[in-house]
């Protein structure tokens, strides 16, 4: 005898809970746990404030630096260098990556050079860049571009290579030219993989800008950390580090939102 199972209707509230992304709770919970352990470490260790400041002391220093305009000045300098370096690296990496994905012999010729370049830390190259281009914004942009370039390049090559060959052949059979192939086939299909490199590149661009500021910067969050270290202003160091983390997180989230918008636009 065949039995049928009863159909259970799921209420909209339950469906909304099922669609709820529990990882969204990760950041607030992590921050709360970090603050709890931080305060516990301050209380139990007994370290003075210039070694391990309390969260309340750092929050007060943050407001002081923000209201005085000091934090804005250094944050905008770091953000300008990071976005400038990212933009430069993105343009070069997209053009070169697309070329390497289609020209095998060129990829084989440049692959050893690109691999060897990664053995040299950017921190070691930064003094040379500053020596050649000065201690201004240009050198920081170049340092940020250097550290950002390779992840975007690799993801560009992988994204183009991952497109099924059959789709490319069908596009050519349909009479598509090179531009139409890029616009209607390669670009939409490569976006998800490509944006993985973009998000990584944005995070690394901030690191590159700070490296340049550490070496010879008079303005920027890296320079602010150097200044605070010389003054034994440990709360200000924590403020600069928290600001860097906030910048990186914001850029990462914005890149994810941009990816969703572009994917929806291409799908429509």
Swiss-Prot record:
Pfam families reported for this sequence: BPD_transp_1
Keyword Transport: yes
Keyword Transmembrane: yes
Coiled-coil stretches: none
PROSITE patterns: ABC_TM1
Membrane topology: Multi-pass membrane protein
GO annotation, biological process: transmembrane transport
Ranges of residues in domain ABC transmembrane type-1: 75-255
Subcellular location: Cell membrane
Chief subcellular location: membrane
SUPFAM superfamilies membership: MetI-like (SSF161098)
One GO cellular component term: plasma membrane
Keyword vocabulary terms for this entry: Cell membrane, Membrane, Transmembrane, Transmembrane helix, Transport
Induction: Expression is probably regulated by riboflavin, via an FMN riboswitch.
Transmembrane stretches, start-end: 24-44, 76-96, 119-139, 140-160, 185-205, 236-256
Family: Belongs to the binding-protein-dependent transport system permease family.
Known function: Part of an ABC transporter complex that transports riboflavin into the cell.
Subunit structure: The complex is likely composed of an ATP-binding protein, a transmembrane protein (RibX) and a solute-binding protein (RibY).
Protein name (Swiss-Prot/TrEMBL): Riboflavin transport system permease protein RibX
């Amino acid at each position: 005898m065949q039995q049928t199972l009863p159909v259970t209707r799921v209420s909209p509230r339950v469906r909304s809970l099922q669609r709820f992304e529990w990882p969204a709770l990760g950041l607030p919970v992590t921050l709360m746990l970090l603050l709890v352990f931080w305060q516990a470490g301050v209380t139990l260790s007994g370290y003075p404030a210039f070694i391990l400041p309390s969260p309340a002391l750092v929050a007060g220093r943050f407001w002081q630096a923000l209201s005085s305009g000091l934090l804005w000045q250094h944050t905008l300098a770091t953000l300008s260098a990071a976005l400038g370096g990212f933009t430069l690296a993105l343009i070069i990496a997209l053009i070169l990556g697309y070329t390497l994905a289609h020209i095998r012999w060129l990829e084989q010729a440049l692959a050893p050079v690109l691999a060897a370049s990664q053995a040299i830390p950017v921190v070691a190259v930064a003094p040379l860049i500053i020596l050649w281009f000065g201690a201004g914004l240009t050198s920081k942009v170049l340092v940020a571009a250097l550290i950002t370039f390779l992840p975007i390049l690799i993801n560009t090559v992988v994204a183009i290579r991952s497109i099924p060959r059959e789709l490319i052949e069908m596009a050519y059979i349909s009479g598509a030219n090179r531009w139409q192939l890029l616009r209607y086939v390669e670009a939409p299909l490569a976006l998800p993989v490509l944006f993985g490199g973009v998000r990584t590149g944005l995070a690394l661009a901030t690191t590159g800008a700070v490296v340049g500021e550490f070496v010879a910067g008079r303005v920027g969050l890296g320079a602010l950390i150097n200044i605070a270290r010389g003054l034994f202003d440990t709360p200000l160091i924590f403020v600069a580090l928290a600001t860097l983390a906030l910048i990186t997180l914001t850029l990462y989230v914005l890149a994810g939102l941009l990816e969703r918008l572009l994917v929806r636009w291409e799908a429509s």
